[in-house]
Design a protein with these regions (language model features):
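Hydrophobic anchor residue at the start of the ABC signature
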Residues: 44-45
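Helix N-cap at the start of a conserved alpha-helix in ABC-type nucleotide-binding domains
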Residues: 66-68
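Catalytic Walker B motif of ABC-type/P-loop ATPase nucleotide-binding domains
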Residues: 55-58
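Conserved hydrophobic alpha-helix in the ABC-type ATPase nucleotide-binding domain
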Residues: 72-73
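Conserved ABC ATPase "signature" region
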Residues: 8-25
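H-loop/switch region of ABC-family ATPase nucleotide-binding domains
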Residues: 89-91
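Conserved ABC ATPase signature
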Residues: 30-34, 38
Length: 105
């Protein structure tokens, strides 16, 4: 369950859930009660609540369908428009196409 004791803003978390295509009822689910893709998006939402200037993610869309991938891209763009920098490693060409800057190795 999401840590309600750590000062998380539930309203903002629910906004993030909606942005990422997650149902609000997932807030009360345990980790083993959600799919891998849902778990991945929940962790992105919870991590974004920390309001750090830099978010580093590794393969944030690896277990997601194309629609969920697009939601993550738009979610990241929204965070960036509020001043957050996101550094990601990805092999997903759809994800890379949605990024401002791409470095290929």
């Amino acid at each position: 369950k999401a840590n309600r004791e750590a000062g998380f803003n539930k309203e903002r978390l629910m906004d993030y859930f909606v942005s990422l295509g997650l149902e609000e009822k997932l807030y009360d689910k345990r980790v083993n009660e959600v799919s891998g893709g849902q778990r991945q998006r929940i962790m992105l939402a919870v991590t974004a609540l920390l309001d750090k200037p830099l978010l580093v993610v590794d393969e944030p869309t690896s277990a997601l369908d194309p629609e969920s991938c697009l939601r993550v891209i738009n979610f990241f763009k929204s965070l960036c428009s509020k001043g957050m920098t996101i550094l990601s490693v990805s092999h997903d060409k759809q994800f890379a196409a949605g990024c401002d800057k791409v470095f290929t190795l």
